[in-house]
Amino acid sequence: KGIIVCMTRTQDADVTKACRVQLANTAGANLFVSIHCNTSDAWDTSANGLECLYATNKKALAAQNKKLAKTILHSLTKTTRLKKRGVIKRNGLYILRKAKIPSTIVEVGYLSNKKDLKTIIKESGQNAIAQGISDGIIQALEGNR
């Protein structure tokens, strides 16, 4: 689809939040999507599903952030069939607070939940997650034209 992806890392090495945000802000990117695995307090195995986090602290980006989060979550729910927990406003998270472009953190499931974990670790689940996120990004970019 002609989309250029800029990865913050390609190996299992720690990259600081500040470095990730700086890369997104200086790379000429249109969107910043940070992908995470969730876990619950005390490893509560009942918590499960997908979430997309967004920030409203920058008024110029607030609506775009929420729309990006909703679009990716909707697409991801279709491809993974995991529970849709919703979009959640989180102004205190460094990555979302410091991004100067539309951004979201995508929580792709709970490591503490057996069903979610199975999706996260299986290649077919990883492909479904990747497809859902990429479909959502494409929809978000097409909606911004």
Write out the residue ranges for each language-model feature.
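Active-site-proximal helix/loop segments of hydrolytic enzymes
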Residues: 1-145
